[in-house]
Swiss-Prot record:
GO terms for biological process: translation. This is Large ribosomal subunit protein uL24. One of its GO terms (molecular function) is rRNA binding. SMART domains: KOW. It holds the Pfam family KOW. One of two assembly initiator proteins, it binds directly to the 5'-end of the 23S rRNA, where it nucleates assembly of the 50S subunit. Signal peptide: none annotated.
Length: 105
């Protein structure tokens, strides 16, 4: 999967189209990412008492995972880009590059 934790991404389709956010968690086995402030849902939790006796529960708003095909990585210029790879000459490791300007991500 070409999107990693910490990347800034732009949502390109869906109800949050045009929103930018930071990837909080990547789920490569499910091809999904959790983006900060995007795809917010209301989750209804049962009321329960915690160890101090205070009750917690009700309606909680939180982010839900979004499919990786609905986001694009934003390059250093702030434009959405596809992601490519190149082999680093010094270390021999794969490095992600932006297809728009060729710079490292």
């Amino acid at each position: 999967m070409k999107v990693h934790k910490g990347d800034t991404v732009l949502v390109i389709s869906g109800k949050d189209k045009g929103a930018k956010g930071k990837v909080l968690v990547a789920y490569p086995d499910r091809n999904k990412v959790l983006v900060e402030g995007v795809n917010r849902i209301k989750k209804h939790t049962a009321v329960s008492a915690n160890e101090r006796g205070a009750s917690s529960g009700g309606i909680v708003t939180q982010e839900a995972p979004i499919h990786v095909s609905n986001v694009m990585v934003v390059d250093s210029d702030g434009k959405p880009t596809r992601v490519g790879y190149r082999i680093d000459d010094e270390t021999g490791k794969k490095v992600r590059i932006a297809k728009t300007n060729g710079k490292d991500i």
